[in-house]
Curated annotation (Swiss-Prot):
Keywords: Membrane, Transmembrane, Transmembrane helix. It is a single-pass membrane protein. One of its GO terms (cellular component) is membrane. It comes from Saccharomyces cerevisiae (strain ATCC 204508 / S288c) (Baker's yeast). The chain crosses the membrane at residues 21-43. It is found in: Membrane. It comes from the Eukaryota. This is Uncharacterized protein YIL046W-A.
Amino acid sequence: MMCVCIPKKKLMDWRVYYIYSYVVCLYMCGSDCACICVLACVVQCVCFNVEMRL
C-alpha cells in the first residue's frame, strides 16, 4: 500500500511540513499503518503494518 506525499512549499517551516506530511500520510494509510516519508516526500510514502515494525 502506498501513500501520496505532499510537496514541500518553499516558505513552509520544516517542522510544520513534517507534522503536516505525517498527518496526511497517517490519514491515507489508516490508523493500523505507519508511514515513512521517502526522500523528504519527494516521491511517495511507504506504508507498512505497525505489527511489522522492529
